[in-house]
């Protein structure tokens, strides 16, 4: 039984899943919006929100925790410099998922996931 197990497996090994989400969260913060399947976007939202929360905290330990996930120095620096001002008024829900329809090859539901910024 799979009671109380959180997170989707997405038909991948744990190492593949971990590497895929690390790459996806890096791309999300680099480009501020990416196109992916609905299931991946829903799982990515959890990780992205955790990274923004770490960036808002801003201390050295939070930065090191972010480096363990993101692994690109310039993306982490950009996130930690911009996040406190971009997401100052939000306590969570830093991403938005928008449905795009079905992919033509396999009819997988496609979405865009983007960062919601509060800048004026």
From Swiss-Prot:
* Molecular functions (GO terms): structural constituent of ribosome
Look up keyword tRNA processing and say if it applies: no
Q: What SUPFAM superfamilies does the record tag this protein with?
A: Prokaryotic ribosomal protein L17 (SSF64263)
The source's superkingdom equals Bacteria
How this chain assembles, per its entry, is: Part of the 50S ribosomal subunit. Contacts protein L32.
Q: Which PANTHER family match?
A: LARGE RIBOSOMAL SUBUNIT PROTEIN BL17M, RIBOSOMAL PROTEIN L17
Q: Which family does it belong to?
A: Belongs to the bacterial ribosomal protein bL17 family.
Q: What is this protein called?
A: Large ribosomal subunit protein bL17
Please name the source species: Desulforapulum autotrophicum (strain ATCC 43914 / DSM 3382 / VKM B-1955 / HRM2) (Desulfobacterium autotrophicum)
């Amino acid at each position: 039984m799979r009671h109380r197990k959180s997170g989707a497996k997405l038909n991948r090994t744990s190492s593949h899943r971990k590497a895929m989400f690390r790459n996806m969260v890096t791309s999300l913060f680099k480009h501020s919006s990416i196109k992916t399947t609905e299931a991946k976007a829903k799982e990515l939202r959890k990780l992205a929100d955790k990274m923004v929360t770490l960036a808002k905290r801003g201390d050295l330990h939070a930065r090191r925790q972010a480096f363990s996930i993101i692994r690109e120095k310039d993306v982490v620096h950009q996130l930690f410099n911009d996040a406190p001002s971009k997401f100052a008024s939000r306590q969570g829900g830093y991403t938005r998922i928008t449905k795009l329809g079905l992919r033509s090859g396999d009819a997988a539901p496609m979405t865009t996931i983007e960062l919601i910024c509060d800048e004026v």
